[in-house]
Amino acid sequence: MNLLWMLVITLVTLQVSIFCTTVFLHRCKTHRGLELNPVVGALLHLELSLFTGVIPRQWAAVHRKHHHFSDEPGDPHSPYIYGLWTVLLGNYYFYRKEANDQAMVRKYTPDWKDDALDKLPFMNYAALVGMAIFMLMFGVWWGLAAWTVHVVLYIFLNSSVNSICHMVGYRNFDNKATNLQSIAFLTAGEGLHNNHHQYPTSARLSLRGHEIDPAWPLIRLLEACKLAKVRQLPMAKAAA
């Protein structure tokens, strides 16, 4: 397999992981903005487990704590507290520090209900299977290199939302988060962060006519196929 195809497959896998993160982890499991068909939810969960290693309950807890203390003391990764570059480059450290605190995870996810995959004892190590899949596709060393690129870019794109999209960009609402359409294109809409902080339970992140939330058409398609149900949207006047 030539390097171009390896790069294409790696970047496609990256974007699939990004879409799974925003649709399953963020909008569905963390904020309850939509419901997913159990099979669809399980597939998105499996993709994330294999190719990111994220444990959904930990992710939801850290993110809910971020909203609770947004850009105030207690925020797990505020660039106003730690600095933009520190969060951009060190967001994974801040995330792991919080995610490893079991008391914090329980506190911020009292409503959590494990799905079938959560209950499997080996799911914490599923990312090793994902790495093996890359190696089977591309060979050991090229596969390891492609997997590393995928993981680093995934972490960096998530970090960019938590850092850049709190300090750089425009605001529709009076909160410290910002909107950046360029980052929204790369993160399936997550870069519309000012909108999200105003209406955190909304299944749609775009509110103005010029804003594009790439994950929203996918959610609408799933809903049209009876595989998802949107539960929350922003107030009509906010989306004007």
Name every feature range the model reports, one short phrase each.
Residues 108-115, 172-192, 196-199:
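Active-site-proximal inter-transmembrane loops
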Residues 1-160, 164, 202-240:
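Non-catalytic, topology-defining segments of multipass membrane proteins
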